[in-house]
Amino acid sequence: MARIAGVNIPNHQHTEIGLTAIFGIGRTRARSICVASGVAFSKKVKDLTDADLEKLREEVGKFVVEGDLRREVTMNIKRLMDLGCYRGVRHRKGLPLRGQRTRTNARTRKGPRRAAQALKK
């Protein structure tokens, strides 16, 4: 297995698909990395030479990926919550941020329904 940006890239996959195992790299960016480094994106990871892997590591190093990207996203959300803006408040309450309805739906964001307790007479 090839190791790029601290992630093991599966050997059996094409280079373009294998690079998407790295957090922060999707199909488009993976393809652009392959083109910039001169590596064929249809080549299997197991067929890459050490020189190819080094070129890929160099290109991936130009982007914010993995732990740094996760930290950056978390800090951005924390900043919104500290500001107390609308989006920050919605993050804090665990509700949708972008104007979706919440009277019904929004179950993914709100979590499972809480059962209503029956009133005693």
UniProtKB/Swiss-Prot annotation:
Recorded name of the encoding gene: rpsM
Database matches in PROSITE patterns: RIBOSOMAL_S13_1, RIBOSOMAL_S13_2
A GO-annotated cellular component: cytosol
Task performed by this protein: Located at the top of the head of the 30S subunit, it contacts several helices of the 16S rRNA. In the 70S ribosome it contacts the 23S rRNA (bridge B1a) and protein L5 of the 50S subunit (bridge B1b), connecting the 2 subunits; these bridges are implicated in subunit movement. Contacts the tRNAs in the A and P-sites.
Pfam families registered for this protein in UniProt: Ribosomal_S13 (PF00416)
Protein name: Small ribosomal subunit protein uS13
Family: Belongs to the universal ribosomal protein uS13 family.
Region of interest (Disordered), residue spans: 94-121
UniProt keyword list: Ribonucleoprotein, Ribosomal protein, RNA-binding, rRNA-binding, tRNA-binding
GO terms assigned for molecular function: rRNA binding; structural constituent of ribosome; tRNA binding
One GO BP: translation
Binding partners and assembly: Part of the 30S ribosomal subunit. Forms a loose heterodimer with protein S19. Forms two bridges to the 50S subunit in the 70S ribosome.
Record flagged with keyword RNA-binding: yes
Top-rank taxon: Bacteria
